[in-house]
Amino acid sequence: LVEKRPDYKIIANFLLHRIVPLQKYVMPVNPFDDHKDSKSSVTGIKNALLHLSEGYPLGIFPAGEVSTFKDGRLVVDKPWEEGAIKVIRKAQVPVVPIYFHAKNSQLFYFLSKIGDTLRTAKLPSELFSQKDRVIKVRIGKPISVNEQNEYKTIEDYSEFLRKKTYMLANSFNKENKLLTVPNLKPQKSPKKI
């Protein structure tokens, strides 16, 4: 993505911002900051909105953290952060949903059970452990501002964006039937008489 759009940035954990090759692509936020109105949060939101208003692309992970195991099962995401959804809505730009089909190491999920701090500290090494792995990504169609504005409450808007994103996961769970049909030929146009 950054080969095509070197101006692309993501809002991500400040620990990822400390990795030198990633610095120019990460707008850092502090997930441990309990005060949503703190200076670091306000600065991050202002920078994100400025970046978007200048026509540059921005990636946001609305859950604010990586999916983890709970009760032995992979959890999709925790509820998406209201603050992230408000930033997306306030930007008034088309939204492109993206679904990542990937897993982290068993150690990462084990540390998640112990605590958020350990899980977060493991993030940089998890990122580098993906180096030779194939990560499946599905990119959806842009959602227009008009379509977004049909959802009046933040809750409805968040649910709409979440559904649009997780609908992209279905392609990884089903085989494409069209590709398995033998001798599929395009229909001929009817002859004019």
Task: Describe the function of each predicted region.
Residues 42-193:
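Non-catalytic C-terminal accessory region of glycerolipid acyltransferases
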Residues 1-38:
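Catalytic core of membrane glycerolipid acyltransferases/transacylases, capturing the structured
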